[in-house]
Amino acid sequence: LRRQRQMCIRDRTEGELWVRGDHICYIGDGTDTSAVCKEDDIIIWDREIDAKGNLLMPGFKNAHTHTPMTFLRSFADDLPLQEWLQQKVFPNEARLKGEDTYWLAILGIMEYLTSGITSNFDMYIMQDYHINAYVDTGFRTVFTSGLNNFTDSLEVLEENYLRINGLSDLTSYVPGFHAEYTTSRP
């Protein structure tokens, strides 16, 4: 239970946020809680956080990420895109092992959280290792398939869809195109 803090919903207001289990069950001023509990219920919380003087607001969402690429940030970023990809990115990515993408994704997730990013849309190579980083950290992600010239068969995409959507309530999978320069068919 969190009381007496500023909340950024539409307008700044004083209010409360209640969490039951891993779901937000109430946001409001604390007077009309009938949707959450009966009037004569005694509510006992595991903990109450006094956040007076703080601001509670929704987390940011990053809608286009390749999370394990944190290791290439600012690496030869003065090159034109195709030159950067062909000469710098792809050769370095080719040296990665599955476990590397797992730990690089963990690093990226930690960076997201320190920046207020609470969910993302992501795509990257070696997705089984990569997606496990999201499941293990409990970070909300929508993993996209990266349809392109290198894409597996539609059957494999369907298997991935069924498998990844069943891993966690916080993890989902949708088809998505990677980029115009990796897809030759219209």
Residue ranges and their predicted role:
Residues 2-9:
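Short, small-residue-biased leader/transition segments that mark boundaries at the very start
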Residues 10-57:
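Histidine-rich, glycine-flanked metal-binding segment
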Residues 17, 22, 53, 64, ...:
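Divalent metal-coordination and catalytic microenvironments
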Residues 71-103, 137-145, 165:
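Active-site gating loops and adjacent loop-to-helix segments of metal-dependent hydrolytic enzymes
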Residues 97-109, 124-127, 152-161:
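Short, acidic/polar
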Residues 118-119, 140:
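Short acidic/polar active-site loop segments enriched in Thr and Asp
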Residues 130-186:
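Metal-coordinating catalytic core of metallo-dependent amide/deamination hydrolases
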